[in-house]
């Protein structure tokens, strides 16, 4: 997709940057609890001449635009870091960010920020990680009070006064409706877990870890929440169902990194994939298959499974870290960058460049003037309250995710096809042990 013009971004800065300070004392999340660099740390020198970003970040402190802003993120492919460095430089910002050959994944990003203690800003992650940061689970990661100009445009995707949504993603269940799939039959489920009784061949991932895999598990387990269950707040029937999903599903070993390939090749009728890359994958589907999926925005031989519950969304957020020894002018520069990056114009440009969907509703309107794509119109059960609790499902996932990971690891879920363990004796399991990390 074409890139938005740099001129538009500069104009945005002239109009909106000057009033990017502020803050709220609330730390309660409203929505929470929905590719070339060398592989080293990259620091871009800033071009400050005539830059609109040199305007004050708030009404009292002039930002130090010579300050190098250290950023941590898991949304850091080489394409993304290169784009961000170049666009930030054009706006007068110095930034330093590692690509994913140095830091890969949300766990690594958070751990590095916590251990290095040199971060000014963190973006990406998901509600689970942000909930942990907000709750103070990382000793060296504290957020400054901050409310951007665009805070009112991100809906419920915010931790008031602390962190604000920038990108929405979800997981999708897709199916072929040609002769390699349902042969014209439509699929309607009540829950994600109904796939195990669909009568069709489905793909399943081959490892426990990974953000997309975790989100698929969260979608599969949604119908089985039980706050009184010792099995990580999930009923035993839920774990039995997830086992069946593994046992009867097709993983393909290392041939499939994610679920698009097996569906695109016609090896399965149903698969799971993440929203942000889907349309780009379908555009290029014929490059890797003799039986490709066709019709990017108007599906020809595939569709979304109609699931009454909806799907599990996550949002990536941005927050300003409280860095020891940073001056007020340097902090003002960090806030100015965050204000700029989360603005409608920049998030629309980011979304167009990388096929992501912005939390910022004004950015979404710019990006999709003809209407929101179907994959982002699905109901979001991550924000539904879990019966018997005062928590949203996203918060419930954040609370129980370590237990779920331990259960799946200890029982051997998501094995390679030729290494299937025996099914557990579900009636005689010590859940108090299984929910703990072993070794």
Which role does the model predict for each range below?
Residues 15-19:
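C-terminal motif of bacterial Sec signal peptides marking the signal peptidase cleavage site
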Residues 55-63, 126-174, 181-194:
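Hinge/lid segment of periplasmic solute-binding proteins
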Residues 316-392:
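Mature extracytoplasmic/periplasmic domains
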């Amino acid at each position: 997709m074409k890139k938005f013009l740099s001129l538009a971004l500069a104009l945005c800065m002239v109009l909106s940057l000057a009033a990017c300070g502020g803050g709220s004392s609330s730390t309660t999340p409203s929505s929470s609890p929905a590719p070339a660099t060398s592989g080293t740390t990259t620091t871009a020198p800033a071009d400050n001449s005539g830059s609109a970003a040199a305007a004050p970040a708030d009404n009292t402190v002039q930002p130090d635009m010579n300050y190098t802003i250290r950023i941590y993120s898991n949304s850091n492919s080489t394409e993304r870091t290169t784009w961000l460095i170049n666009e930030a430089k054009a706006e007068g910002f110095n930034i330093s960010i590692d690509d994913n050959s140095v830091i890969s994944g949300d766990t690594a990003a958070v751990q590095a920020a916590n251990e290095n203690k040199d971060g000014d800003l963190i973006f990406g992650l998901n509600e689970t990680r942000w909930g942990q940061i907000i709750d103070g689970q990382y000793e060296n990661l504290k957020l400054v009070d901050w409310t951007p100009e665009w805070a009112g445009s991100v809906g419920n995707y915010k931790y008031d006064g602390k962190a604000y949504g920038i990108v929405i993603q979800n997981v999708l269940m897709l199916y072929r409706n040609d002769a390699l799939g349902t042969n014209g039959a439509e699929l309607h489920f009540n829950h994600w877990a109904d796939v195990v009784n669909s009568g069709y061949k489905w793909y399943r991932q081959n490892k426990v870890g990974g953000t997309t895999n975790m989100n698929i598990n969260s979608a599969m387990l949604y119908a089985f929440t039980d706050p009184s269950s010792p099995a990580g707040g999930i009923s035993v029937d839920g774990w039995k169902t997830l086992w069946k999903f593994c046992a009867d599903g097709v993983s393909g070993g290392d041939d499939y990194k994610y679920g698009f390939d097996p569906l695109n090749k016609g090896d399965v009728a149903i698969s799971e994939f993440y929203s942000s890359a889907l349309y780009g994958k379908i555009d290029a589907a014929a490059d890797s298959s003799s039986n490709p999926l066709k019709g990017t925005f108007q599906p020809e031989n595939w569709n979304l499974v109609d699931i009454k519950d909806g799907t599990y969304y996550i949002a990536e957020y941005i927050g300003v870290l409280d860095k020891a020894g940073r001056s007020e002018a340097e902090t003002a520069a960090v806030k100015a960058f965050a204000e700029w990056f989360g603005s409608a114009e920049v998030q629309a440009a980011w979304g167009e460049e990388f096929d992501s969907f912005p939390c910022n509703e004004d950015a979404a309107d710019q990006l999709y003037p003809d209407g929101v794509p179907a994959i982002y119109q699905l109901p979001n059960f991550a924000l539904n309250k879990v019966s018997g609790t005062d928590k949203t499902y996203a918060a419930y996932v954040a609370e129980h995710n370590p237990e779920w990971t331990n259960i799946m690891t200890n029982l051997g879920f998501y094995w390679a096809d030729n290494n299937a363990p025996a099914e557990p004796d579900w009636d005689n399991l010590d859940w108090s042990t299984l929910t703990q990390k072993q070794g």
